[in-house]
Amino acid sequence: TLNDPDNKNSLSEEMLLNLSQIIKEASFKKSIKVIVIAAKGDVFCSGHNLKEITAARNHKDNGAEYFKDLFDKCSLLMQSIVNCSKPVIAEVCGIATAAGCQLVASCDLAISSKSSKFATPGVNLGLFCSTPMVALSRNVAKKDAMKMLLTGDMIDSHEAKRISLINDYVSSENLTSTVMELANKIAEKSSKTVKIGKEAFYNQVELSLSDAYEYTSNVMAENTMNDDAKEGISSFIDKRKPTW
């Protein structure tokens, strides 16, 4: 849970490091099946901490080293979510802007409250949302992404769902229960199979059509050989619940 509402849950250096560490640790815990990223307050995540960025300009190099390190840390966090062996769900209640919108786009799934809003407003500040663009452009259509990036306009939950930035939106009162229902449904599946599937999904989307089919054919062949596939198929034939 992002727990810095006084600073609008901005991705400070400390927040970036903490989130990265939590994702890393959760990846290796067998007891954890699904990761949910939620937030306290009425802002899910406002992006980078602009006060920290402004303060860094007082460094001898005008902040050059700090800025490179900051954006590298943020990029590593987003990649750790994609590379995490567990599905990651964003539970968005409130506003998600800039790197906060990037965080939502980087998660495997995202459910928001109906009142939530999203934006990549860096262009309005003279600082284009270049790293958020990576996650955004890989999750929504190019023209929808470019419109958000070039205008900096805020979009509502309905539009966010239309462009596939989020999976769905519900009332604030039902948000947590809806997310938990989704998380529990996934948690009932074979963790080994989910891990194989998530990794294969992100790997194949970067490949050509023929290479993607060659790669996924190998993945499925190997998957078919493991114990969970054997148990799953047997339980289906026997009309019983599988035991993973």
Please describe what each predicted stretch is.
Residues T1-K40, L76-Q79:
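Conserved CoA-thioester-binding segment of acyl-CoA-metabolizing enzymes
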Residues Q79-K192, M225-N226, E231-S234, R240:
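Crotonase-fold acyl-CoA enzyme core
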Residues D4, N18-L19, I37, N49, ...:
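Terminal peptide-recognition signature
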Residues E14-N18, K73, S80, T178, ...:
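Charged catalytic carboxylate motif
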Residues K24, A39-S80, A96, S208:
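Glycine- (often His-adjacent) and acidic-residue-rich active-site loop
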